[in-house]
């Protein structure tokens, strides 16, 4: 439900991989569109050093350049470090109206923001979906007032129904990939019912049929199947 790496689209999965969240091939374009709308003229980019980070960074870089936005530098960062002042120094030396942080809010991405604020290098952050969460707001508060980002979501009829069901169950439906997780679980159950089996081969055989039947959907990704 939260696997968005573009590389997974062409994965040799033997028919066993499905996802209810859109690929970062689209997410990166949307984030670039928002960057343009916010009048950013130049941006430095840092990404978590894995397939998710590299894939999204590549798409975002190409998309912002297509909008005429200057990319001053693109660097990877490793998660789990205690200090990110070196990475921020590299980003700062390249300059930019903002720094795009493609990573995780509880890992290196948060460290990049902290080091940027501590040094005064940047005060505007472009945030990938993995950086969106209440804990980031709790950590930095008003220091994020110039920042922006994007994450997959839905405003369709199914999303409204899910929000009511989730609220009744004490679940915050606005959380990242909550709706997509529900979709994924529901599709697995429906595929099991359709094949009258919990065998993985049977589930894989039936999951697209039940998805395309539009029996249940809450997310944009699932909407597109119908």
PLM region spans:
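Extracytosolic ligand-binding ectodomains
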Residues: 1-219, 226
